[in-house]
């Protein structure tokens, strides 16, 4: 199957705010090959990612992603990996390339699965898919009372695990954060799994992060996610060396396999979180999942946007029965909610399951998302390199 066309669609809510909510805009990718159409989603700035696909070549190691993709054959998983390797070489100085390629790569897996009549996870070598325990992924409220109500709501909906992140954490004093953690625990109940995400707020300040450990332990948190910058491996290792009962989590900032492995080997995290929309797609995420198994680290998806992205993020570890928890975007913006025609919902036991339909198993509702489409055009020296294509 030859890659005939790659289309990018920049979607956005009418108003974008400064809250740490990545579902306010989206970049969908539609790929046509061999009579099949596949969809993917980049977890990145839409306009910058489109530019990385079409930009003029700067030199031999800084080429647009487009040059390595269009016209290529995609008849096997090995072909997808081969294209990814070419991009790593030809676009090594184009730092946005991995994010752009991520969405294209997902779409290629979607196409390959549809062509073979199998879900992506089977193409990755899994015989069966294991159910995952979804944790409702939420932002902290502006105050503990607001946080309490948010967590109570998801508990009432049947979720036994919840993650609270960003918001005011790390911006005030230790007591302020302790009150937020306690509110999360109160809302979830004694038996729920509480996860805390600091959103990299402490940079590489180990002492500031460590000052929160007693409060996290008191709240019974399972992990402390991204206390530091995504590449501050020494800071992660220093905090892990204090042997807290709470394990560290990180890895969503990895935009290649090497960064993810470094987080495991040098950052000493107990949970490695990979975003297929950033790392280069499903293939590199599967490599990290296998590496995590070998290193005794728990693999977890990172997804805070649509259920198209959720399906893609589940594929790399679908068959890993011992890696049971899954990030579940609980309160995304309307844009993200409307991308998928059929959302991935918990079953009667509270588990979610990766789709078993061919490809990613998620149909994109082009009519529903048309109202979010942002018309964009990139013109260089009088030549149009990109113009928003038609959705249907």
Regions found by a protein language model. Give the residues of each.
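Shared catalytic-loop signature of beta/alpha-barrel
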Residues: 214, 220, 231-250, 254-351, ...
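Conserved, mostly hydrophobic/aromatic
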Residues: 3, 35, 104, 117, ...
């Amino acid at each position: 199957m030859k890659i005939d066309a790659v289309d990018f669609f920049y979607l956005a809510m009418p108003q974008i705010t400064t809250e740490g909510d990545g579902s306010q805009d989206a970049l969908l990718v539609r790929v046509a090959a061999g009579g099949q159409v596949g969809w993917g989603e980049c977890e990145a700035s839409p306009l910058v990612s489109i530019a990385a696909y079409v930009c003029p070549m700067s030199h031999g190691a800084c080429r647009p992603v487009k040059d390595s993709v269009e016209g290529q054959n995609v008849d096997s998983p090995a072909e997808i990996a081969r294209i990814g390797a070419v991009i790593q070489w030809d676009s090594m100085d184009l730092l946005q390339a991995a994010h752009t390629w991520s969405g294209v790569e997902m779409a290629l897996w979607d196409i390959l699965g549809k062509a073979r009549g199998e879900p992506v996870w089977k193409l990755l070598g899994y015989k069966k898919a294991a159910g995952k325990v979804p944790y409702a992924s939420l932002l902290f409220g502006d105050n503990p009372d607001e946080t309490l109500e948010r967590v109570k709501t998801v508990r009432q909906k049947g979720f036994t695990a919840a993650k609270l992140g960003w918001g005011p954490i790390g911006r005030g004093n230790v007591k302020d954060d302790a009150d937020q953690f306690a509110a999360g625990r109160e809302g979830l109940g004694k038996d729920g799994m509480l996860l805390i995400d600091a959103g990299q707020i402490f940079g590489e300040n180990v002492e500031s992060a460590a000052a929160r450990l007693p409060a996290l332990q008191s709240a019974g948190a399972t992990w402390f996610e991204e206390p530091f910058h995504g590449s501050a491996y020494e800071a992660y290792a220093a905090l892990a060396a204090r042997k807290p009962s709470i394990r560290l989590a990180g890895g969503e900032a990895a935009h290649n396999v090497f960064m993810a492995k470094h987080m495991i080997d040098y950052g000493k995290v107990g949970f490695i979180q990979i975003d297929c929309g950033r790392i280069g797609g499903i293939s590199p995420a599967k490599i990290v999942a296998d590496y995590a198994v070998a290193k005794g680290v728990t693999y977890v998806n990172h997804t805070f946007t649509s259920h198209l992205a959720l399906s893609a993020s589940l594929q790399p570890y679908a068959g890993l029965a011992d890696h049971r928890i899954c990030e579940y975007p609980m309160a995304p913006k309307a844009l993200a909610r409307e991308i998928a025609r059929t959302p991935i919902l918990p079953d009667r036991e509270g588990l979610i399951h990766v789709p078993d339909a061919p490809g990613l198993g998620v149909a994109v509702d082009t009519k529903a998302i048309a109202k979010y489409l942002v018309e964009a055009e990139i013109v260089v020296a009088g030549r149009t390199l990109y113009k928003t294509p038609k959705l249907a």
